[in-house]
Amino acid sequence: MKYTTLFIFIVLISIPGQIVQANKTPMDSASMEMAIALLHESDLSRGNVSGIEWDIDIESKSKGKTQRNSLRVLVKGTNALAIYQSPIKVKGRKLLMKDRNMWFIKPGLSKPVPISPRQKLLGGASNGDIASTNYAGDYTIKSFTKDQFNNEPCFLYDLKAKNKKVTYDRIRYWVSKKRKIGLKAEFFTLSGKMFKTAFFEYDHTIAVNGEERPFVSKMIILNAMVKTDKTIMAYHNIKIKKISPSSFNLNLLVR
């Protein structure tokens, strides 16, 4: 099987809402501190906590074909391990994302297969990067404005990548002012072209630092280049737990 086909399994949104003209927010120090804090909080509702495990069902539609896969996913900080559960032909395969590097691991292979930056822009690999985006950690706030999405008051962030390790150079990100969760994101390549659009739903809740907060239940990812391509990620069985660093040890995973 070609590696680009395998990428459709990678884990780590469907109608755009009404967008109204944005109102500029002054970029003074107090406003910037508020914007940064809100961005950090929005990340907590998508998995950027001390340790988390979940199951994800993925349905991907591309070129008239539909693929369905289920994965068990472990996440801690910027590290993520996806273990294929179904269909049976891919069960046991693994994908490791560590410090923005990515590897594919298959039973029977003596060495992991590294996924190049170019390959990360293809197929499901780009969707995996969208699912695991660390907005507060990997991006700088160039500007933020008052806006609305689906009639909900938001801040619209214009984010710029801090370095070239991340897949997307720029992101436009709508964050709910009241609920402190990301609702929509547009992802741009280095050339300035919009590549993907993501929509987020939050029907789960988790406890973070003793406080209940909404947690992502579904992501719908649309391809701006190929209008018919669509990926839906549904999250289940979410558990906050301690995850050992050894879970992301590449040498141990290929044994």
Sequence positions of predicted segments:
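Bacterial N-terminal signal peptides
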Residues: 6-15
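Flexible, processing/modification-adjacent segments and terminal tails
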Residues: 23-40, 47-50, 57, 67, ...
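Gly/Pro-enriched, hydrophobic low-complexity segments
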Residues: 152-248
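Sec/Tat signal peptide C-region and signal peptidase I cleavage site
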Residues: 15-22
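Hydrophobic residues embedded in beta-strands of well-ordered beta-sheets
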Residues: 79-80, 102, 112, 182
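Short, surface-exposed charged micro-motifs
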Residues: 70-72, 93-94, 172-174, 199
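N-terminal, post-signal-peptide region of Sec/Tat-exported proteins
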Residues: 50-81, 85-87, 180
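Positively charged n-region of N-terminal signal peptides that target proteins for export
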Residues: 1-4
